[in-house]
Amino acid sequence: MLHLLKKYAFKDITMSMLVDECRINKTTFYRHYSDKYDLIEKISKDYISLFSKASSNFVNGINVHNIDCLIQFFDDNKDELLILESKILPINIFEDMHAIMTLDLCTYFKKSINQDDLIKLYASLISNNILTTIKWYHKNYLNFERNQIIQIVLQTVETGLEQSITAIMKKGKR
């Protein structure tokens, strides 16, 4: 399926294309999947399961190791995730990732903050920031080293976006 998604829009992929690409007959395909929607959902769930393992570290905090593990997940699955992000699909794997990471961060914040709405807001904002930064890095990684991205994520989480940009601007004037 992912190989076909490199070339075609999801809506244009036919059952014949799938069975030809997989070199199986329709009976074998239908034994495992009800249709192409079921197949893409199962593919997505496989990546979500792997992501969940990497994200689960965030229940213990936001640090270099945890961000590095998340970047490693994206490195290991870069091509596939970029395909899943670039196409119009009946699933949104990145929304699912955001929801998982937000829950992990909520678990962490509940250890020291006692306001559920505030916890959910901050966890969602931080999760979006981390995931957006890592996705951007994987599209533009030639311009940045991995450690730079980790430091940018940490700095924006710890001090806020505006202060992070101001610090970078001050360094640039030296």
What is each PLM-predicted segment?
Residues 2, 6, 11-23, 30-60, ...:
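An amphipathic alpha-helix adjacent to DNA-recognition modules
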Residues 69, 88-132, 162:
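Amphipathic alpha-helical packing segments from all-alpha helical-bundle domains
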Residues 14, 82-84, 93, 146:
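Short, hydrophobic secondary-structure boundary micro-motifs
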Residues 58, 81-84, 109, 137-141, ...:
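Secondary-structure edge/capping motif, primarily at the C-terminal ends of alpha-helices
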Residues 6-8, 114, 118, 133-139, ...:
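Cytosolic nucleotide-binding catalytic cores of signal-transduction proteins
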Residues 1-5, 51, 74, 101, ...:
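Short hydrophobic clusters on alpha-helical segments that form packing/core surfaces
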Residues 139-174:
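C-terminal peripheral helix-coil segments that are non-catalytic and often amphipathic
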Residues 54-82:
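Hydrophobic alpha-helical connector segments
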